[in-house]
A protein has these predicted regions:
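A short beta-strand element within the Helicase C-terminal
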Residues: 215-216, 390, 399-412, 421, ...
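Conserved segment of the helicase C-terminal RecA-like domain
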Residues: 425-459
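Conserved interdomain hinge at the start of the Helicase C-terminal
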Residues: 303-341, 347-352
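Conserved helicase ATPase core of P-loop NTP-dependent helicases/translocases
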Residues: 166, 181-193, 347-348, 359-396
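Walker A/P-loop
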Residues: 123-146
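Conserved pre-motif I regulatory segment
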Residues: 54, 84-130
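Conserved Walker A/P-loop ATP-binding site and its immediately adjacent core
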Residues: 138-174, 343-344
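Post-DEXD/H (motif II) to motif III coupling segment of the RecA-like Helicase ATP-binding lobe
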Residues: 216, 224-289, 465
Length: 481
């Protein structure tokens, strides 16, 4: 007798047919506390318990991408399970994949892990691909587009920024794409339908379900942003889009975040890591230099009473701290990227650098138009000594700069995704590039037994460096009053 039946409802949801007891077990298994819920207004107001429930007990529906995890759950409890035949794996061999790739006449060889990732995606018909920076993610996306692109099955490629709209178009043309690539972002036509469209998610998330019915395949780059309600809304509205893939360089350590992504896109596909790519010489060698700035007893005492926002404001306005970052950037050889989080801090650093060097100093933030950002990116790649002061939110995601030698992480962050993405900006290989150096700037304002936020976040980053097997060294620098 079957205990659990997984029945396909549409491309987004499955229905779980079972008795009430098993339903409650499954609902509990797929319920998670949302990270940071204690600081959210609804939780503070007592309107929400801080949990996200992926299984709806009103209709026993759950994201279809979680079928594999539900099957594992049932087998662990000896439940007999019946899986809808439409949810199974497709037959697609390595040999078939190689023949298909050969027919594309690509300008270079597809790496082994790229081939295997492509095959796994096709077999599953969906998937969440963990693809480190410079692992050739855009080529895998291109292969999927060409494989699924037949009459009546156009591809919608969703990226987080207008810079990536232009960059993805350039990558596809480099691979030999002859199709017209329609770009959708602010000020562009959103109703034109063609073989492939590249769009920012901000441009389309308010569109009705009917608009998404026109697409046969949806691919989301930087899919970890799906924790934002807008991308979740897009994927939930695309109820008839069977081929769906998410690509990301990393996931947060939150189980809730991971489960939502798998639910929307499918099982995780991870076939290579950053350290493996460095070892295989596909990426530049990485050196992480952790610089811990030390402050006077007077300043430690002054900062000991500050909350997080106040500490960040105190640090970013600290004259000697900003001078240290400026001098560090000016002392480095090669192209340097200085990443900031707050606009006022970035503007101050940019002004300081311009006062000392008017040549090849650039500024990039959300206010800079996408085409202008792309021009700056191209300029950097043709220079040997430039400094770009850039918003971490804009430049840590997906921007492809080959000739980048140094990165200065000027603003504290404990976000695993943000840190790994920032490091990833400098790992692409170039003929004149020996390695990439990542400068992790943190602050020791410890007073008595109280450890400040910047130092706490630094300790979490060190744990990340150890986990990722990055080569790092810690240096302490005294900032004189």
């Amino acid at each position: 007798m079957v205990d659990v039946t997984i029945k396909r409802v549409n491309s987004v949801y499955n229905e779980i047919i079972c008795d009430r007891g098993i339903s409650m077990e499954l609902a509990d298994e797929f319920t998670f506390m949302v990270p940071g819920h204690k600081f959210m207004p609804k939780f503070k107001a007592g309107l929400w318990d801080g949990k996200i429930r992926l299984m709806d007990l009103r209709n026993n529906q759950i994201y279809s991408g979680l079928s594999k995890k539900i099957t594992k759950f049932c087998k662990a409890r000896d439940y007999i399970i019946d899986l809808d035949s439409s949810l199974g794996y497709a037959e697609f061999s390595i040999i078939e994949a190689k023949e298909f790739i050969k027919s594309l006449n690509l300008p270079f060889e597809v790496r082994d892990y790229q081939l295997k990732t492509f095959v796994q995606c096709v077999r599953q018909n969906r998937g969440l691909v963990l693809s480190p920076t410079a692992s050739g993610k855009s080529l895998i996306i291109y292969l999927l587009h060409r494989y699924y692109n037949f009459p009546g099955n156009p591809t919608l490629l969703i990226v987080p920024t207008t810079s990536l709209v232009h960059q993805m178009e350039g990558d596809f043309k480099q691979y030999g794409c002859m199709d017209h690539i329609h770009k959708i972002y602010s000020g562009q036509d959103k109703d034109m339908l063609c073989d492939i469209a590249v769009s920012t998610w901000q441009s389309i998330y308010k569109f009705p379900k009917e608009w998404f019915d026109a697409w046969g395949t949806i691919i989301v780059d930087e899919a970890h942003h799906a924790q934002a309600k807008s991308i979740t809304t897009i994927m939930e509205r695309a109820i008839n889009v069977e081929h769906r893939f998410g690509f990301t360089g990393t996931l947060s350590d939150s189980q809730c975040h991971e489960m939502v992504l798998e639910g929307l896109f499918g099982p995780i596909i991870s076939l290579v890591t950053t350290s493996e790519l460095i070892e295989q010489k596909h990426l530049s060698p990485l050196r992480v230099k952790c610089i811990v700035l030390k402050y006077s007893d007077t300043q430690r005492k002054e900062a000991s009473k500050l909350d997080y926002a106040q500490e960040m404001d105190w640090l970013f306005k600290h004259r000697r701290r900003n001078t240290f970052i400026k001098n560090l950037a000016l002392s480095l050889k090669g192209n340097t990227l200085v990443l900031f989080r707050y606009i006022s801090h970035g503007q101050e650093l940019h002004k300081d650098l311009l006062d000392k060097s008017n040549d090849n100093v650039y500024y990039v933030a959300g206010s800079v138009e996408g085409e202008a950002r792309e021009e700056i990116r191209k300029i950097i790649d043709t220079h040997e000594n430039s400094i770009t002061v850039a918003s971490a939110g804009v430049f840590s995601t997906g921007i492809n700069i080959v000739h980048l030698d140094n990165i200065i992480f000027a603003a504290p962050s404990k976000s695993r995704i943000r840190v790994l993405q920032s490091i990833g900006r400098g790992l692409r290989k170039a003929d004149s590039k020996e390695h990439c150096t990542f400068f992790d700037v943190s602050d020791d304002l410890t007073h008595r037994k109280r450890m400040n936020f910047s130092l706490r976040h630094f300790q979490e980053r060190v744990q990340l460096y150890n986990k990722e097997l990055f080569d790092y060294k810690i240096y302490q620098v005294n900032l004189k009053e």
